[in-house]
């Protein structure tokens, strides 16, 4: 569940069992969006943080870049608050640590402004993809998400999906 929310600071503190979809539903009326999450919204925040998942956001990298702090429960029952500045070694060991350090119980996340996007689909030969990405996607200021997927048996024709901001 949501523990704290500040639309003006663009932050939210949640229990680790909440799904990304529930967060987005909660913040959407405030014109906000999750800053970084994996492609699908049905995963839990705790699970996503424990593997330091990534999405298809251009220029943002893995989910750790949007995490302000976590509450971590160690195997012996000790509870620690951790962030980049406080207990940083626990923060960076837990995010992407697959539960080896402890269980992430809560997380404070950065949010972003919510923008309307348009989905663009393309198929092309795999040999043309690098030039397409370099020339059409990488420096496009409107491009928000992008990925190219290969599906059997068409391993030479990626399905390209881009989402771009619209006015």
Indicate where each model-derived feature is located.
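Glycine-rich N-terminal segment of FAD-binding domains in flavoprotein oxidoreductases
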Residues: 1-42, 51-57
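A structural signal for short, hydrophobic beta-strand segments that form beta-sheets
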Residues: 2-3, 64-67, 104
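Gly/Ser/Thr-rich beta-alpha loop segments that engage phosphate groups in nucleotides
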Residues: 19, 48-49, 57, 63, ...
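Flexible loop/turn segments at secondary-structure boundaries
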Residues: 20-22, 43-45, 111, 154-157
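Short loop/turn motifs at secondary-structure junctions and domain boundaries
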Residues: 33, 61-65
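Short, glycine/charge-rich beta-strand/loop segments that flank catalytic centers
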Residues: 36-49, 68, 150-152
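Catalytic micro-motifs at enzyme active sites that drive phosphoryl/nucleotidyl and oxygen chemistry
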Residues: 56-60, 90-93
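C-terminal substrate-binding/cap subdomain adjacent to the FAD-binding core in PCMH-type
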Residues: 68-167
């Amino acid at each position: 569940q949501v523990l704290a929310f500040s639309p003006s600071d663009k932050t939210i503190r949640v229990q680790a069992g909440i799904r990304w979809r529930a967060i987005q539903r909660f913040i959407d009326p405030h014109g906000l969006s999750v800053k970084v999450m994996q492609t699908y919204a049905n995963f839990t925040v705790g699970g996503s943080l424990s593997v330091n998942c990534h999405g298809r956001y251009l220029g943002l990298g893995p989910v750790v870049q949007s995490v302000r702090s976590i509450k971590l429960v160690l195997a012996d029952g000790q509870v620690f608050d951790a962030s980049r500045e406080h207990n940083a070694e626990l923060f960076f060991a837990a995010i992407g640590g697959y539960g080896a350090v402890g269980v992430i119980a809560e997380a404070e996340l950065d949010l972003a402004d919510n923008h309307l996007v348009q989905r663009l689909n393309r198929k092309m030969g795999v040999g043309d993809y690098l030039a397409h990405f370099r020339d059409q996607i990488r420096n496009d200021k409107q491009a928000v998400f992008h990925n190219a997927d290969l599906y059997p048996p068409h391993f030479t024709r990626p399905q390209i999906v881009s989402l771009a901001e619209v006015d």
